[in-house]
C-alpha cells in the first residue's frame, strides 16, 4: 500500500489528477515516507530479534507490546494524514506542524505528535530490551568486538551481535533526540520560544540515525544468513570490528550533510559533516560490500529467491550509497538540494 502511495505521487506530478487539491499530495507524501521508514525499522528489528534467539533471549512480552503500540501509532498516522490532510513531510520541520493555515486542523497536528510519541516510546523500549538481552551474555567490550582490535582471545562474537549492538546504541541516542524535539514542540505550543536551528538539527539527527540503523540491521541479517547459502562462514575479525567501531562514532556526525543550506551553521560544522559522510561510507559500505563479494566468489552458492534478494539488496545499498556520498559534497549539494536526486539516492536502498 505504501508503494502504491508512492506511485500515486508520481502520477500526480505527471498531471494525471488535474482536479485534485495539492494538499493531498503532501498528506500522502507524509504517510508514504514515515510509513516506509517505520515499516523498514520494525521489519529489521523483528528480523534481528528472531536471529538473536540463537545467541540471546529478547523478551517476547516486549515484542508483543511493541506490536500493539506500533499498530496504534500507525492508525493515528493514517488518521492525521489521510483524514486530516496533515502534510509536513517526514521531517516535520519546526514550526510547520504548528501552523496548518487552514489546511489541517489542530487535532491532526496533535494526533501526529501522539503517534510519534507512542512509536518512540515503544521502539525505545524494544531497543533497550534487545541491548539488555545481548548484555546478559556479552560484555559491552565483547559485543563491540574490542577484543579483536587488541588481539586478545575471548568469546567468539557473531557479526549480527556486533552490528546490532552498534546500531542500537546509536539508536538510543537518536530516540533521545526525538524526545527532546517533541518536548520542544510542546513547549512552543505553550508559548515558549525555541531555536529553529536546534530543532532542525535534532530532527535530522534523529531521522538520519533511524534510517541508517534500519539499513545496518538489514546488513546484520545478511551477515548472519548469506553464509548459509554460500556454504562459508562470515566471522567477526579485526577488519569487521574496526569498521563497525568507526560507524559507532561517525554516524553521530554524518547528519550534518542535511544542513548545508543553513548558512547560520558554523563553517567547521559543514566541513566536518562532509568529512564524516565520506568516511562513514567506508566502514559500513565498502567492508560489507567487499565482504559479500568475497563470500560469494568461487563458492557453491545456492541461488534462491532469498539469497538473490540478499545479494541485490547489498548491491542496491552500494549504488544508493555512492549517490549519497556524491550528494554529501558541499559543492554538489548546492545544486542537487531539493531536486529529484535526493529521493533517487535513497530509493535503491
Place the predicted regions along the sequence by residue.
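Hydrophobic cores of alpha-helical transmembrane segments in multi-pass integral membrane proteins
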Residues: 1-16, 22-95, 105-137, 156-190, ...
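Short, membrane-exposed interhelical loops at transmembrane-helix boundaries
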Residues: 98-101, 335-337
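Membrane-interfacial, low-structure loops and terminal tails that flank and connect transmembrane helices
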Residues: 139-155
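Non-cytosolic membrane-interface motifs at loop->transmembrane helix junctions
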Residues: 266-277, 337-343
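Histidine/acidic residue-rich metal-binding segments in metalloenzymes
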Residues: 297-303
Amino acid at each position: 500500500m505504501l508503494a502504491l502511495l508512492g506511485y500515486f505521487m508520481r502520477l500526480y506530478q505527471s498531471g494525471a489528477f488535474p482536479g485534485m487539491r495539492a494538499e493531498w499530495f503532501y498528506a500522502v507524501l507524509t504517510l508514504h515516507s514515515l510509513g516506509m521508514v517505520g515499516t523498514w525499522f520494525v521489519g529489521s528489528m523483528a528480523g534481528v530479534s528472531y536471529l538473536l534467539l540463537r545467541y540471546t533471549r529478547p523478551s517476547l512480552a516486549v515484542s508483543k507490546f511493541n506490536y500493539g503500540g506500533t499498530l496504534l501509532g500507525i492508525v493515528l498516522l493514517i488518521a492525521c494524514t489521510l483524514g486530516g490532510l496533515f502534510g509536513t513531510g517526514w521531517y516535520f520541520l519546526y514550526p510547520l506542524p504548528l501552523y496548518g493555515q487552514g489546511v489541517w486542523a489542530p487535532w491532526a497536528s496533535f494526533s501526529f505528535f501522539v503517534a510519534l510519541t507512542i512509536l518512540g516510546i515503544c521502539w525505545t523500549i524494544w531497543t533497550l530490551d534487545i541491548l539488555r538481552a545481548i548484555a546478559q551474555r556479552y560484555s559491552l567490550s565483547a559485543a563491540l568486538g574490542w577484543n579483536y582490535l587488541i588481539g586478545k582471545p575471548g568469546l567468539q562474537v557473531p557479526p549480527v551481535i556486533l552490528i546490532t549492538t552498534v546500531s542500537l546504541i546509536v539508536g538510543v541516542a537518536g530516540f533521545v533526540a526525538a524526545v527532546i524535539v517533541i518536548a520542544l514542540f510542546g513547549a512552543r505550543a505553550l508559548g515558549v520560544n525555541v531555536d529553529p536551528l536546534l530543532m532542525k538539527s535534532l530532527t535530522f539527527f534523529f531521522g538520519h540515525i533511524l534510517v541508517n540503523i534500519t539499513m545496518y540491521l538489514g546488513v546484520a541479517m545478511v551477515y548472519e544468513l548469506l553464509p548459509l547459502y554460500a556454504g562459508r562462514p562470515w566471522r567477526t575479525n579485526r577488519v569487521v570490528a574496526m569498521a563497525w567501531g568507526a560507524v559507532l562514532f561517525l554516524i553521530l556526525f554524518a547528519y550534518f550533510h542535511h544542513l548545508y543550506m543553513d548558512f547560520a551553521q558554523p563553517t567547521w560544522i559543514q566541513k566536518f559533516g562532509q568529512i564524516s559522510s565520506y568516511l562513514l561510507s567506508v566502514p559500513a559500505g565498502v567492508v560489507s560490500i567487499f565482504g559479500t563479494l568475497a563470500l560469494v566468489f568461487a563458492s557453491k552458492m545456492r541461488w534462491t529467491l532469498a539469497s538473490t534478494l540478499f545479494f541485490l539488496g547489498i548491491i542496491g545499498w552500494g549504488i544508493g550509497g555512492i549517490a549519497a556520498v556524491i550528494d554529501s559534497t558541499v559543492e554538489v549539494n548546492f545544486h542537487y538540494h531539493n531536486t529529484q536526486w535526493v529521493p533517487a539516492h535513497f530509493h535503491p536502498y
